[in-house]
Swiss-Prot record:
One GO location term (cellular component): nitrate reductase complex
Subunit structure: Dimer of heterotrimers each composed of an alpha, a beta and a gamma chain. Alpha and beta are catalytic chains; gamma chains are involved in binding the enzyme complex to the cytoplasmic membrane.
Major localisation: membrane
Record keyword Transcription present: no
Disulfide partners: none
Induction comment: By nitrate.
UniProt enzyme class: oxidoreductase
GO terms for MF: electron transfer activity; heme binding; metal ion binding; nitrate reductase (quinone) activity; nitrate reductase activity
Provenance organism: Escherichia coli (strain K12)
Stretches of the chain found on the membrane's Cytoplasmic side: 30-47, 113-124, 199-225
EC code(s) of this entry: 1.7.5.1
Reactions listed under catalytic activity: nitrate + a quinol = a quinone + nitrite + H2O
Highest taxon, organism lineage: Bacteria
Name the record gives this protein: Respiratory nitrate reductase 1 gamma chain
Name of the gene this protein is made from: narI
């Protein structure tokens, strides 16, 4: 048990991270034709907008919340944001984003499996990744009742300590998870596994998000007379 704990929370994060970065780079260099979202909207528009919007809004909220919530050093906000308040914000905002993502993910998965035209262009990797994302989202929602048992933020700070130890390459990161509920550990392992699978799936299109679109100049479109 001690070996598994050390492997999954001291070693596995770096395996997943290395595959995530190196795999993405190699795919960009050698597989640019596959570097796409492979949208299926033209094949079946029914319910696509609702499902896609719910899923993407939810997952964006989850990503932003996890990124800043887990990786922001405590000293940067302790003077104006008590840990108990941060815990409540994480539970409510994360819960709302999780519900949106879960509903959208289930609708997208249903469409992938039961729409004949979409199913014909769907790969096993598509179904696997979307299924894992739905499961991961459900696991995240299931952690909320466990978080509610530690409203002082102690459980959350253990997870924060682990994440910050990993990204700053401090040894013994797994020690921060002593006493943490199994549901959190499962959530962490599946999350790292998604990073491991990232370069081999259509998730790769996230790297090409058109951020510059937000700041580009307006385009003038003139009618021909």
């Amino acid at each position: 048990m001690q070996f598994l704990n050390m492997f999954f929370f001291d070693i596995y994060p770096y395996i997943a991270g290395a595959v995530f970065l190196i795999g993405s780079w190699l795919r960009y260099d050698y597989g640019q034709y596959t570097w796409r979202a492979a949208s299926s909207q033209m094949l079946d528009r029914k319910g696509m907008n609702l499902a896609s919007n719910l899923f993407h809004i939810g997952i964006l909220g989850i990503f932003v919340g996890h990124f800043f919530g887990m990786l922001t050093p405590h000293w940067m906000y302790e003077a104006w944001l008590p840990i108990e308040v941060k815990q409540k914000m994480a539970m409510f905002a994360g819960g709302a984003s999780g519900v949106l993502c879960l509903i959208g993910g289930v609708l997208l998965l249903k469409r992938r499996l039961f729409s004949p035209r979409v199913r014909a262009t769907t790969t096993g990797a598509d179904i696997l990744i979307l299924s894992l994302l739905v499961i991961q989202c459900a696991l995240g929602l299931l952690t909320i009742p466990f978080s509610a048992q530690h409203m002082d933020g102690s459980e959350m700070m253990k997870l924060v300590g682990w994440a910050q130890s990993v990204v700053t390459f401090h040894g013994g990161a797994s020690q921060h998870l002593d006493g943490v509920a199994f549901i959190f550990r499962l959530h962490l392992v599946l999350g790292m596994t998604l990073f491991l699978l990232f370069p081999f799936s259509r998730l790769i299109h996230i790297w090409s998000v058109p951020v510059e679109y937000l700041t580009r100049k307006y385009q003038l479109v003139r009618a021909r007379h």
